[in-house]
Protein backbone atom coordinates (compact mmCIF):
# COMPACT_ATOMS: atom_id res chain seq x y z
CA UNK A 1 0.00 0.00 0.00
CA UNK A 2 1.09 3.54 -0.71
CA UNK A 3 1.64 5.72 2.36
CA UNK A 4 -0.24 9.01 2.77
CA UNK A 5 3.07 10.92 2.73
CA UNK A 6 4.01 9.33 -0.63
CA UNK A 7 0.60 10.24 -2.06
CA UNK A 8 0.96 13.87 -0.89
CA UNK A 9 4.46 14.05 -2.39
CA UNK A 10 3.11 12.81 -5.74
CA UNK A 11 0.32 15.39 -5.65
CA UNK A 12 2.83 18.18 -4.92
CA UNK A 13 5.10 17.00 -7.76
CA UNK A 14 2.11 16.81 -10.13
CA UNK A 15 1.04 20.34 -9.15
CA UNK A 16 4.60 21.65 -9.58
CA UNK A 17 4.89 20.13 -13.05
CA UNK A 18 1.53 21.62 -14.07
CA UNK A 19 2.48 24.97 -12.54
CA UNK A 20 5.65 25.01 -14.65
CA UNK A 21 3.58 24.29 -17.78
CA UNK A 22 1.11 27.06 -16.93
CA UNK A 23 3.91 29.54 -16.22
CA UNK A 24 5.58 28.53 -19.49
CA UNK A 25 2.36 29.11 -21.43
CA UNK A 26 1.82 32.48 -19.74
CA UNK A 27 5.37 33.53 -20.58
CA UNK A 28 4.77 32.54 -24.22
CA UNK A 29 1.61 34.68 -24.31
CA UNK A 30 3.32 37.63 -22.60
CA UNK A 31 6.29 37.47 -24.95
CA UNK A 32 4.22 36.76 -28.08
CA UNK A 33 4.93 39.22 -30.87
CA UNK A 34 1.86 41.22 -31.95
CA UNK A 35 3.36 42.43 -35.24
CA UNK A 36 3.56 39.77 -38.00
CA UNK A 37 7.05 38.61 -38.96
CA UNK A 38 6.72 39.04 -42.72
CA UNK A 39 4.84 41.04 -45.33
CA UNK A 40 1.83 39.71 -47.26
CA UNK A 41 -0.73 41.16 -49.64
CA UNK A 42 -2.50 42.69 -46.62
CA UNK A 43 0.54 43.39 -44.37
CA UNK A 44 3.08 46.12 -45.17
CA UNK A 45 6.22 47.17 -43.26
CA UNK A 46 7.73 50.63 -43.65
CA UNK A 47 11.02 51.82 -42.19
CA UNK A 48 10.82 55.19 -40.44
CA UNK A 49 14.45 55.55 -39.41
CA UNK A 50 14.96 58.40 -41.90
CA UNK A 51 11.42 59.78 -41.43
CA UNK A 52 9.41 58.26 -44.29
CA UNK A 53 8.23 60.74 -46.93
CA UNK A 54 4.51 61.44 -46.53
CA UNK A 55 3.86 60.97 -50.27
CA UNK A 56 5.36 57.48 -50.16
CA UNK A 57 3.27 56.60 -47.09
CA UNK A 58 0.04 57.79 -48.74
CA UNK A 59 0.93 55.98 -51.98
CA UNK A 60 1.38 52.68 -50.11
CA UNK A 61 -1.95 53.12 -48.35
CA UNK A 62 -3.71 53.90 -51.66
CA UNK A 63 -2.32 50.67 -53.16
CA UNK A 64 -3.59 48.64 -50.22
CA UNK A 65 -7.09 50.16 -50.13
CA UNK A 66 -7.43 49.57 -53.89
CA UNK A 67 -6.72 45.85 -53.37
CA UNK A 68 -7.83 44.08 -50.19
CA UNK A 69 -7.00 46.64 -47.52
CA UNK A 70 -4.87 45.51 -44.59
CA UNK A 71 -2.47 46.87 -41.96
CA UNK A 72 0.62 49.04 -42.45
CA UNK A 73 3.26 49.11 -39.69
CA UNK A 74 5.38 52.27 -39.72
CA UNK A 75 8.65 51.61 -37.87
CA UNK A 76 9.31 48.05 -39.09
CA UNK A 77 11.96 47.04 -41.66
CA UNK A 78 11.20 44.86 -44.70
CA UNK A 79 12.86 41.88 -42.99
CA UNK A 80 10.58 42.28 -39.94
CA UNK A 81 13.08 43.99 -37.62
CA UNK A 82 11.40 46.55 -35.37
CA UNK A 83 13.24 49.86 -35.43
CA UNK A 84 10.52 52.25 -34.25
CA UNK A 85 8.44 55.13 -35.55
CA UNK A 86 10.04 58.56 -36.08
CA UNK A 87 9.01 61.21 -33.53
CA UNK A 88 7.40 63.22 -36.35
CA UNK A 89 4.91 60.38 -36.96
CA UNK A 90 4.01 59.58 -33.35
CA UNK A 91 0.65 61.38 -33.50
CA UNK A 92 -2.05 58.88 -34.69
CA UNK A 93 -4.65 61.63 -35.16
CA UNK A 94 -2.24 63.61 -37.31
CA UNK A 95 -1.57 60.50 -39.44
CA UNK A 96 -5.31 59.87 -39.97
CA UNK A 97 -5.86 63.53 -40.93
CA UNK A 98 -2.90 63.45 -43.33
CA UNK A 99 -4.21 60.36 -45.14
CA UNK A 100 -7.76 61.77 -45.35
CA UNK A 101 -6.47 65.05 -46.81
CA UNK A 102 -4.07 63.43 -49.29
CA UNK A 103 -6.53 60.95 -50.87
CA UNK A 104 -9.38 61.41 -53.37
CA UNK A 105 -12.05 60.53 -52.44
CA UNK A 106 -11.03 61.00 -48.83
CA UNK A 107 -10.00 57.73 -47.17
CA UNK A 108 -10.74 57.09 -43.50
CA UNK A 109 -8.23 54.86 -41.68
CA UNK A 110 -7.58 53.92 -38.04
CA UNK A 111 -4.16 54.58 -36.53
CA UNK A 112 -2.65 53.90 -33.11
CA UNK A 113 0.75 53.63 -31.46
CA UNK A 114 1.56 50.10 -30.29
CA UNK A 115 4.61 48.94 -28.37
CA UNK A 116 6.63 45.91 -29.45
CA UNK A 117 9.87 44.80 -27.75
CA UNK A 118 9.79 48.12 -25.88
CA UNK A 119 9.77 50.08 -29.17
CA UNK A 120 6.89 52.23 -30.44
CA UNK A 121 5.37 51.48 -33.87
CA UNK A 122 2.53 53.26 -35.71
CA UNK A 123 -0.14 50.76 -36.76
CA UNK A 124 -2.49 51.94 -39.55
CA UNK A 125 -5.57 49.82 -40.34
CA UNK A 126 -6.70 50.33 -43.94
CA UNK A 127 -10.17 49.27 -45.18
CA UNK A 128 -10.74 47.87 -48.66
CA UNK A 129 -12.29 50.70 -50.65
CA UNK A 130 -15.62 50.24 -52.46
CA UNK A 131 -14.40 52.54 -55.23
CA UNK A 132 -11.10 53.64 -56.78
CA UNK A 133 -8.93 55.81 -54.50
CA UNK A 134 -6.17 58.10 -55.80
CA UNK A 135 -3.58 60.28 -54.09
CA UNK A 136 -4.36 64.01 -54.15
CA UNK A 137 -1.85 64.45 -56.99
CA UNK A 138 -3.69 61.87 -59.15
CA UNK A 139 -1.61 58.74 -58.54
CA UNK A 140 -3.61 55.46 -58.56
CA UNK A 141 -1.89 52.35 -57.19
CA UNK A 142 -2.81 48.73 -56.58
CA UNK A 143 -1.05 45.94 -54.72
CA UNK A 144 0.12 42.58 -56.04
CA UNK A 145 2.42 39.70 -55.12
CA UNK A 146 5.74 39.24 -56.89
CA UNK A 147 6.88 35.75 -58.02
CA UNK A 148 8.80 35.32 -54.74
CA UNK A 149 5.59 35.95 -52.75
CA UNK A 150 6.54 39.41 -51.47
CA UNK A 151 4.10 42.30 -52.09
CA UNK A 152 4.63 45.43 -54.15
CA UNK A 153 2.67 48.49 -55.28
CA UNK A 154 2.20 48.99 -59.02
CA UNK A 155 0.27 51.59 -61.04
CA UNK A 156 -3.39 50.92 -61.81
CA UNK A 157 -3.70 51.73 -65.50
CA UNK A 158 -6.87 53.21 -67.05
CA UNK A 159 -7.82 49.92 -68.77
CA UNK A 160 -7.73 48.14 -65.37
CA UNK A 161 -10.22 50.51 -63.73
CA UNK A 162 -13.41 49.06 -65.33
CA UNK A 163 -12.39 45.56 -64.21
CA UNK A 164 -11.80 46.73 -60.64
CA UNK A 165 -15.13 48.58 -60.51
CA UNK A 166 -16.91 45.53 -61.96
CA UNK A 167 -15.41 43.35 -59.22
CA UNK A 168 -16.76 45.82 -56.65
CA UNK A 169 -20.21 45.78 -58.35
CA UNK A 170 -19.81 49.50 -59.06
CA UNK A 171 -19.79 49.19 -62.86
CA UNK A 172 -21.44 46.82 -65.33
CA UNK A 173 -18.93 46.52 -68.15
CA UNK A 174 -21.29 44.28 -70.13
CA UNK A 175 -23.84 47.13 -70.33
CA UNK A 176 -21.42 49.59 -71.96
CA UNK A 177 -21.50 50.46 -75.67
CA UNK A 178 -18.53 48.71 -77.28
CA UNK A 179 -16.26 51.35 -78.77
CA UNK A 180 -15.92 50.95 -82.55
CA UNK A 181 -18.84 48.53 -82.94
CA UNK A 182 -21.79 49.20 -85.27
CA UNK A 183 -25.05 47.37 -85.98
CA UNK A 184 -23.40 45.81 -89.05
CA UNK A 185 -21.15 43.86 -86.66
CA UNK A 186 -24.13 41.80 -85.41
CA UNK A 187 -24.73 38.46 -87.13
CA UNK A 188 -28.32 37.69 -88.24
CA UNK A 189 -27.60 33.96 -88.00
CA UNK A 190 -26.74 34.39 -84.32
CA UNK A 191 -30.03 36.19 -83.74
CA UNK A 192 -31.83 33.18 -85.28
CA UNK A 193 -29.82 30.93 -82.97
CA UNK A 194 -30.88 33.10 -80.01
CA UNK A 195 -34.56 32.75 -80.94
CA UNK A 196 -34.21 28.96 -81.25
CA UNK A 197 -32.58 28.75 -77.83
CA UNK A 198 -35.45 30.76 -76.31
CA UNK A 199 -37.92 28.42 -78.00
CA UNK A 200 -36.35 25.09 -77.03
CA UNK A 201 -34.59 25.87 -73.71
CA UNK A 202 -37.49 27.27 -71.69
CA UNK A 203 -36.56 30.89 -72.24
CA UNK A 204 -38.89 33.87 -71.89
CA UNK A 205 -41.38 33.09 -74.69
CA UNK A 206 -42.68 36.68 -74.77
CA UNK A 207 -39.37 37.65 -76.38
CA UNK A 208 -40.30 35.63 -79.47
CA UNK A 209 -43.17 38.02 -80.19
CA UNK A 210 -40.81 41.01 -80.53
CA UNK A 211 -39.22 42.40 -83.67
CA UNK A 212 -35.43 42.15 -83.97
CA UNK A 213 -34.94 45.72 -82.79
CA UNK A 214 -37.37 45.28 -79.89
CA UNK A 215 -35.63 42.03 -78.93
CA UNK A 216 -32.21 43.71 -78.97
CA UNK A 217 -33.48 46.54 -76.78
CA UNK A 218 -35.31 44.20 -74.37
CA UNK A 219 -32.10 42.22 -73.73
CA UNK A 220 -29.96 45.41 -73.73
CA UNK A 221 -27.94 44.11 -76.67
CA UNK A 222 -27.99 47.64 -78.08
CA UNK A 223 -28.11 51.19 -76.72
CA UNK A 224 -29.18 54.41 -78.34
CA UNK A 225 -26.80 57.35 -78.46
CA UNK A 226 -27.66 60.58 -80.32
CA UNK A 227 -30.51 58.77 -82.06
CA UNK A 228 -28.27 55.94 -83.33
CA UNK A 229 -28.25 52.33 -82.06
CA UNK A 230 -24.89 50.79 -81.12
CA UNK A 231 -24.11 47.26 -79.85
CA UNK A 232 -23.26 46.89 -76.17
CA UNK A 233 -20.57 44.51 -74.92
CA UNK A 234 -23.38 42.02 -74.19
CA UNK A 235 -24.74 42.46 -77.72
CA UNK A 236 -21.37 41.72 -79.30
CA UNK A 237 -20.74 38.77 -76.99
CA UNK A 238 -24.05 37.14 -77.92
CA UNK A 239 -24.61 38.18 -81.56
CA UNK A 240 -21.31 39.57 -82.83
CA UNK A 241 -19.49 38.36 -85.93
CA UNK A 242 -16.46 36.25 -85.02
CA UNK A 243 -13.89 38.41 -86.83
CA UNK A 244 -15.25 41.62 -85.25
CA UNK A 245 -15.29 40.07 -81.77
CA UNK A 246 -11.64 39.09 -82.23
CA UNK A 247 -10.82 42.67 -83.24
CA UNK A 248 -12.98 44.71 -80.83
CA UNK A 249 -13.17 42.29 -77.86
CA UNK A 250 -9.88 40.35 -77.98
CA UNK A 251 -10.41 39.32 -74.35
CA UNK A 252 -13.48 37.21 -75.26
CA UNK A 253 -11.64 34.00 -76.12
CA UNK A 254 -12.34 30.43 -75.05
CA UNK A 255 -10.25 27.24 -75.14
CA UNK A 256 -11.41 23.60 -75.01
CA UNK A 257 -8.67 21.06 -74.24
CA UNK A 258 -8.50 17.31 -73.76
CA UNK A 259 -5.29 16.03 -72.17
CA UNK A 260 -4.34 12.37 -71.66
CA UNK A 261 -1.19 12.31 -69.58
CA UNK A 262 1.19 14.61 -71.43
CA UNK A 263 -0.55 14.06 -74.79
CA UNK A 264 -2.88 16.79 -76.10
CA UNK A 265 -5.87 15.06 -77.72
CA UNK A 266 -7.79 18.27 -78.46
CA UNK A 267 -6.93 21.96 -78.28
CA UNK A 268 -9.54 24.28 -79.78
CA UNK A 269 -9.44 28.07 -79.33
CA UNK A 270 -12.32 30.26 -80.49
CA UNK A 271 -13.59 33.84 -80.54
CA UNK A 272 -17.09 32.82 -81.64
CA UNK A 273 -20.08 34.56 -79.98
CA UNK A 274 -21.16 32.96 -76.72
CA UNK A 275 -24.28 31.17 -77.99
CA UNK A 276 -22.29 29.39 -80.70
CA UNK A 277 -19.49 28.65 -78.23
CA UNK A 278 -21.91 27.10 -75.71
CA UNK A 279 -23.34 24.76 -78.34
CA UNK A 280 -19.89 23.86 -79.70
CA UNK A 281 -18.46 23.11 -76.24
CA UNK A 282 -21.52 21.03 -75.32
CA UNK A 283 -21.00 18.92 -78.46
CA UNK A 284 -17.29 18.52 -77.67
CA UNK A 285 -18.16 17.33 -74.16
CA UNK A 286 -20.46 14.55 -75.41
CA UNK A 287 -17.52 12.83 -77.09
CA UNK A 288 -15.44 12.88 -73.89
CA UNK A 289 -18.08 12.11 -71.26
CA UNK A 290 -18.60 8.32 -71.06
CA UNK A 291 -21.62 6.86 -69.25
CA UNK A 292 -22.11 3.98 -66.83
CA UNK A 293 -25.49 2.28 -66.43
CA UNK A 294 -27.29 1.77 -63.12
CA UNK A 295 -30.16 -0.67 -62.59
CA UNK A 296 -33.21 1.13 -61.24
CA UNK A 297 -36.17 -1.21 -60.93
CA UNK A 298 -36.89 -2.54 -64.42
CA UNK A 299 -34.85 0.19 -66.07
CA UNK A 300 -31.18 0.87 -66.71
CA UNK A 301 -30.31 4.51 -66.03
CA UNK A 302 -27.18 6.06 -67.63
CA UNK A 303 -24.81 7.91 -65.27
CA UNK A 304 -22.33 10.23 -67.04
CA UNK A 305 -18.75 10.70 -65.87
CA UNK A 306 -19.55 14.41 -65.43
CA UNK A 307 -23.07 15.71 -64.84
CA UNK A 308 -24.41 17.43 -67.97
CA UNK A 309 -26.31 20.00 -65.88
CA UNK A 310 -23.24 20.77 -63.73
CA UNK A 311 -21.03 21.15 -66.81
CA UNK A 312 -23.55 23.46 -68.48
CA UNK A 313 -23.90 25.65 -65.38
CA UNK A 314 -20.13 25.74 -64.88
CA UNK A 315 -19.71 26.84 -68.48
CA UNK A 316 -22.41 29.53 -68.21
CA UNK A 317 -20.93 30.84 -64.94
CA UNK A 318 -17.45 31.02 -66.46
CA UNK A 319 -18.60 33.13 -69.42
CA UNK A 320 -21.20 35.12 -67.49
CA UNK A 321 -19.08 36.20 -64.50
CA UNK A 322 -15.61 36.48 -66.04
CA UNK A 323 -13.75 39.78 -66.25
CA UNK A 324 -13.91 40.88 -69.90
CA UNK A 325 -11.31 43.60 -69.35
CA UNK A 326 -8.58 40.98 -68.80
CA UNK A 327 -6.77 39.49 -71.81
CA UNK A 328 -7.15 35.84 -70.81
CA UNK A 329 -9.38 33.04 -72.11
CA UNK A 330 -12.03 30.90 -70.45
CA UNK A 331 -10.47 27.43 -70.33
CA UNK A 332 -12.25 24.07 -70.29
CA UNK A 333 -9.87 21.15 -69.76
CA UNK A 334 -10.67 17.43 -69.49
CA UNK A 335 -7.74 15.65 -67.85
CA UNK A 336 -7.03 12.27 -66.26
CA UNK A 337 -7.93 13.66 -62.82
CA UNK A 338 -11.16 15.39 -63.85
CA UNK A 339 -12.76 18.44 -65.43
CA UNK A 340 -11.45 21.99 -64.94
CA UNK A 341 -13.27 25.19 -65.93
CA UNK A 342 -11.32 28.40 -65.25
CA UNK A 343 -12.25 32.00 -66.02
CA UNK A 344 -10.38 35.33 -65.68
CA UNK A 345 -11.19 37.53 -62.68
CA UNK A 346 -11.43 36.33 -59.08
CA UNK A 347 -14.59 36.21 -56.98
CA UNK A 348 -16.37 39.54 -56.89
CA UNK A 349 -16.59 41.52 -53.65
CA UNK A 350 -18.57 39.66 -50.99
CA UNK A 351 -18.07 36.15 -52.42
CA UNK A 352 -15.57 33.67 -50.98
CA UNK A 353 -15.02 29.92 -50.68
CA UNK A 354 -17.07 29.65 -47.48
CA UNK A 355 -20.22 31.47 -48.65
CA UNK A 356 -20.37 30.30 -52.28
CA UNK A 357 -23.65 28.48 -51.70
CA UNK A 358 -25.25 30.97 -49.32
CA UNK A 359 -24.33 34.45 -50.57
CA UNK A 360 -27.07 36.43 -52.32
CA UNK A 361 -26.79 36.02 -56.11
CA UNK A 362 -24.96 38.92 -57.76
CA UNK A 363 -22.48 38.92 -60.61
CA UNK A 364 -19.78 40.92 -62.33
CA UNK A 365 -21.85 41.44 -65.52
CA UNK A 366 -25.53 41.92 -64.54
CA UNK A 367 -26.81 42.79 -68.06
CA UNK A 368 -25.12 39.74 -69.60
CA UNK A 369 -26.39 37.54 -66.75
CA UNK A 370 -29.95 38.83 -67.16
CA UNK A 371 -29.87 38.22 -70.93
CA UNK A 372 -28.66 34.63 -70.43
CA UNK A 373 -31.42 34.01 -67.86
CA UNK A 374 -34.16 35.33 -70.14
CA UNK A 375 -32.80 33.38 -73.10
CA UNK A 376 -32.94 30.18 -71.04
CA UNK A 377 -29.23 29.38 -70.74
CA UNK A 378 -28.62 30.51 -67.16
CA UNK A 379 -30.46 29.48 -63.99
CA UNK A 380 -33.34 31.96 -63.58
CA UNK A 381 -32.93 32.17 -59.79
CA UNK A 382 -29.24 32.99 -60.11
CA UNK A 383 -28.41 29.80 -58.17
CA UNK A 384 -26.51 27.96 -60.91
CA UNK A 385 -23.84 27.11 -58.33
CA UNK A 386 -26.41 24.83 -56.62
CA UNK A 387 -26.74 22.81 -59.83
CA UNK A 388 -22.97 22.41 -60.03
CA UNK A 389 -22.82 20.91 -56.52
CA UNK A 390 -25.99 18.89 -57.03
CA UNK A 391 -24.47 17.28 -60.14
CA UNK A 392 -21.74 15.63 -58.04
CA UNK A 393 -23.69 14.96 -54.84
CA UNK A 394 -26.60 13.00 -56.38
CA UNK A 395 -24.12 10.43 -57.70
CA UNK A 396 -22.24 10.19 -54.39
CA UNK A 397 -19.10 11.79 -55.79
CA UNK A 398 -16.68 14.29 -54.14
CA UNK A 399 -17.86 17.90 -54.04
CA UNK A 400 -16.79 20.35 -56.77
CA UNK A 401 -13.59 22.13 -55.74
CA UNK A 402 -12.98 25.90 -56.01
CA UNK A 403 -9.95 25.92 -53.69
CA UNK A 404 -7.47 26.87 -56.46
CA UNK A 405 -9.32 30.14 -57.11
CA UNK A 406 -7.14 33.25 -56.75
CA UNK A 407 -7.64 37.01 -57.01
CA UNK A 408 -7.01 36.78 -60.77
CA UNK A 409 -9.13 33.78 -61.84
CA UNK A 410 -11.90 31.43 -60.67
CA UNK A 411 -11.12 27.73 -61.05
CA UNK A 412 -13.73 24.97 -60.78
CA UNK A 413 -12.49 21.36 -60.57
CA UNK A 414 -14.83 18.36 -60.77
CA UNK A 415 -13.03 15.14 -59.88
CA UNK A 416 -13.43 11.88 -61.79
CA UNK A 417 -14.93 9.34 -59.39
CA UNK A 418 -17.00 6.17 -59.44
CA UNK A 419 -20.66 6.77 -58.54
CA UNK A 420 -21.97 5.42 -55.24
CA UNK A 421 -24.97 3.52 -56.61
CA UNK A 422 -26.61 2.81 -53.23
CA UNK A 423 -26.37 6.49 -52.28
CA UNK A 424 -27.69 7.53 -55.71
CA UNK A 425 -30.70 5.23 -55.34
CA UNK A 426 -31.44 6.63 -51.89
CA UNK A 427 -31.47 10.20 -53.26
CA UNK A 428 -33.52 9.17 -56.30
CA UNK A 429 -36.10 7.30 -54.23
CA UNK A 430 -36.57 10.25 -51.88
CA UNK A 431 -36.92 12.73 -54.74
CA UNK A 432 -39.49 10.46 -56.42
CA UNK A 433 -41.40 10.26 -53.13
CA UNK A 434 -41.38 14.05 -52.74
CA UNK A 435 -42.03 14.75 -56.41
CA UNK A 436 -39.20 17.32 -56.46
CA UNK A 437 -35.46 17.70 -56.02
CA UNK A 438 -33.95 17.75 -52.54
CA UNK A 439 -32.80 21.22 -51.34
CA UNK A 440 -29.09 21.92 -51.69
CA UNK A 441 -28.55 22.04 -47.89
CA UNK A 442 -30.06 18.55 -47.54
CA UNK A 443 -27.79 17.26 -50.30
CA UNK A 444 -24.70 18.87 -48.73
CA UNK A 445 -25.43 17.25 -45.36
CA UNK A 446 -26.08 13.83 -46.91
CA UNK A 447 -22.83 14.15 -48.87
CA UNK A 448 -20.92 15.08 -45.68
CA UNK A 449 -22.31 12.03 -43.87
CA UNK A 450 -21.52 9.80 -46.83
CA UNK A 451 -17.85 10.87 -46.83
CA UNK A 452 -17.31 11.36 -43.08
CA UNK A 453 -19.62 8.53 -41.92
CA UNK A 454 -20.45 10.00 -38.50
CA UNK A 455 -20.81 13.67 -37.50
CA UNK A 456 -22.26 15.89 -34.77
CA UNK A 457 -24.28 19.01 -35.60
CA UNK A 458 -21.24 21.21 -34.91
CA UNK A 459 -19.11 19.09 -37.25
CA UNK A 460 -21.82 19.13 -39.95
CA UNK A 461 -21.99 22.94 -39.73
CA UNK A 462 -18.21 23.21 -40.04
CA UNK A 463 -17.93 20.80 -43.00
CA UNK A 464 -20.86 22.23 -44.98
CA UNK A 465 -20.55 25.94 -44.02
CA UNK A 466 -24.22 25.89 -42.99
CA UNK A 467 -25.09 27.67 -39.72
CA UNK A 468 -25.67 25.31 -36.76
CA UNK A 469 -29.31 26.32 -36.25
CA UNK A 470 -30.18 25.76 -39.91
CA UNK A 471 -28.08 22.58 -40.08
CA UNK A 472 -29.92 21.13 -37.08
CA UNK A 473 -33.32 21.89 -38.64
CA UNK A 474 -32.31 20.24 -41.93
CA UNK A 475 -30.81 17.18 -40.22
CA UNK A 476 -33.94 16.58 -38.13
CA UNK A 477 -36.05 16.64 -41.31
CA UNK A 478 -33.70 14.08 -42.86
CA UNK A 479 -34.08 11.92 -39.75
CA UNK A 480 -37.88 12.13 -40.04
CA UNK A 481 -37.62 11.15 -43.72
CA UNK A 482 -35.59 8.08 -42.77
CA UNK A 483 -32.48 9.18 -44.69
CA UNK A 484 -30.38 9.79 -41.57
CA UNK A 485 -30.12 7.90 -38.28
CA UNK A 486 -29.44 9.70 -34.97
CA UNK A 487 -27.76 8.32 -31.88
CA UNK A 488 -26.86 9.74 -28.47
CA UNK A 489 -28.27 12.71 -26.56
CA UNK A 490 -27.63 16.46 -26.34
CA UNK A 491 -24.05 17.41 -27.26
CA UNK A 492 -23.08 13.75 -27.64
CA UNK A 493 -25.75 13.25 -30.31
CA UNK A 494 -24.31 12.23 -33.67
CA UNK A 495 -25.71 11.32 -37.07
CA UNK A 496 -25.01 8.73 -39.76
CA UNK A 497 -26.61 7.86 -43.08
CA UNK A 498 -29.62 5.58 -42.81
CA UNK A 499 -28.67 1.96 -42.15
CA UNK A 500 -30.73 1.05 -45.24
CA UNK A 501 -27.98 2.47 -47.44
CA UNK A 502 -25.26 0.41 -45.77
CA UNK A 503 -27.42 -2.73 -45.69
CA UNK A 504 -28.01 -2.48 -49.43
CA UNK A 505 -24.27 -2.06 -50.01
CA UNK A 506 -23.52 -5.09 -47.80
CA UNK A 507 -26.22 -7.15 -49.54
CA UNK A 508 -24.79 -6.37 -52.98
CA UNK A 509 -21.30 -7.26 -51.77
CA UNK A 510 -22.63 -10.52 -50.30
CA UNK A 511 -24.41 -11.39 -53.56
CA UNK A 512 -21.18 -10.83 -55.48
CA UNK A 513 -19.23 -13.02 -53.05
CA UNK A 514 -21.85 -15.80 -53.27
CA UNK A 515 -21.82 -15.67 -57.08
CA UNK A 516 -18.02 -15.91 -57.11
CA UNK A 517 -18.13 -18.81 -54.62
CA UNK A 518 -20.67 -20.67 -56.78
CA UNK A 519 -18.51 -20.17 -59.88
CA UNK A 520 -15.47 -21.44 -57.98
CA UNK A 521 -17.41 -24.49 -56.70
CA UNK A 522 -18.53 -25.41 -60.24
CA UNK A 523 -14.97 -24.97 -61.51
CA UNK A 524 -13.59 -27.15 -58.69
CA UNK A 525 -16.20 -29.86 -59.36
CA UNK A 526 -15.39 -29.95 -63.09
CA UNK A 527 -11.65 -30.03 -62.37
CA UNK A 528 -12.06 -32.89 -59.86
CA UNK A 529 -14.21 -34.88 -62.34
CA UNK A 530 -11.56 -34.55 -65.07
CA UNK A 531 -8.82 -35.52 -62.60
CA UNK A 532 -10.74 -38.68 -61.56
CA UNK A 533 -11.29 -39.63 -65.21
CA UNK A 534 -7.57 -39.29 -65.95
CA UNK A 535 -6.63 -41.37 -62.87
CA UNK A 536 -9.03 -44.15 -64.01
CA UNK A 537 -7.28 -44.34 -67.37
What do the PLM-derived regions correspond to, one by one?
Residues 242-243, 417, 500-502, 518:
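Short loop segments at secondary-structure junctions
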Amino acid sequence: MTSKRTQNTRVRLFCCKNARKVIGLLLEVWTMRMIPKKETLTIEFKSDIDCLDEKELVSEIVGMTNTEGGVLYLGVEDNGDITGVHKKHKDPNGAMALIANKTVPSLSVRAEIIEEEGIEVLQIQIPMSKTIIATSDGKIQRRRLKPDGSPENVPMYPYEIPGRLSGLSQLDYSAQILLGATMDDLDENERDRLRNIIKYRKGDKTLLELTDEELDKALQLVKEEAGVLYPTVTGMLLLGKEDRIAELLPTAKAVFQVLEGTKVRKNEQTSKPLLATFEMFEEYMKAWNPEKEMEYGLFRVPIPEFSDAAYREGLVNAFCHRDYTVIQAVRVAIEDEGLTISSPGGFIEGVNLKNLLTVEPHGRNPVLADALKRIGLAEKTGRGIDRIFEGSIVFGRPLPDYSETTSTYVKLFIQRAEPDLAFTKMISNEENRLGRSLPINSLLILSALQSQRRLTIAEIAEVTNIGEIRAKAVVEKLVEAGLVDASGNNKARFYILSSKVYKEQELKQLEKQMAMQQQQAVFNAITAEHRDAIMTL
